[in-house]
Amino acid sequence: MAISASELNATRAWNAFYAPGTPKDIDLPTGSLYDMLEGSANRFGDRVAIEFFGEETTYAELREQVDRVAEGLRLEGVGERTRVALIMPNCPQHVIAFYAVLRLGGIVIEHNPIYTPDEHERQFRDHEADIAIVWTKVVATLRRMRPDTVPSRLISVDITRAMPLRLRLGLRLPTKAVREKRAALVSRAPETKPFERLLACEPIDDSYPRPTVDSIAVLQYTSGTT
C-alpha cells in the first residue's frame, strides 16, 4: 500500500526543526566514493580539502595524488577486490591511500595503529590482506607477528613528509626535545617501499576500470575513529 507524502512527513518529527528552506528530501549521489572525490575536484578544485599542521592540499591536488598512488598500487598488483590494510594515524597519506585503493576497486581494511602485534595478527589472519600501507612507527610491530601473517608487501608512510617545510626542518634541530618528538613521529622502516615512490608515479590512466556502487569498499574492524 502506497504512503502519501503527508503521511510520510508525519512520521518524521524532526522535520519540524529544519530551518526554513531546508529540503526534506535530497537526491543521493549514485557514483562511487572515488567518483564523489573526482566530482569535488572538478567543481571545487582550488578549495582546501585537507589541512595538516598548516599544510594545505586542494581538491585538485588531492585527486592527482590519489591517481598517482593508485597507479603505484596497480604496479604492486592491487586491483579489483584486492584487500589492502591501512595502518596509519589521521594524516594526508591516509586519505590518499584510502581513495587510491578504491580507485582500483580494491577493498580498504583499517587497522588501529596502536594495536599490539597479537591484535594486528588476529585481524590479518581474518582478512588475509597481503599488502599494507603502514606508518613507519608500526612496521616494527608488524615484524613481531608470526612470519606467515606479515604481509609480503609493506609500503611505509613517514607522516612528517606531509607537514609544512618549516616543521620538517624544525624536526631536524639537534636538541634532546626535538629528537624525542621526531622519534615519536617516525622510525626507520627497512625492507619496505616508501610511500613517496607511489606518489612519484604517473597518474593512473583514466580508462582503467572503475568500481561500481555495488563494489565492496571497506572491511571495517575499528571503532570508526581512524
PLM region spans:
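Conserved pre-ATP/AMP-binding loop-to-beta segment of ANL
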Residues: 45, 181-221
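Alpha-helix N-cap/start motif
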Residues: 80-81, 108, 213
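Helix N-cap/beta->alpha junction signal
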Residues: 88-90, 135-136, 215
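AMP-dependent adenylate-forming
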Residues: 9-15, 20, 35-61, 187, ...
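Conserved AMP-binding/adenylate-forming core of the ANL superfamily
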Residues: 27-29, 36-38, 46-91, 95-99, ...
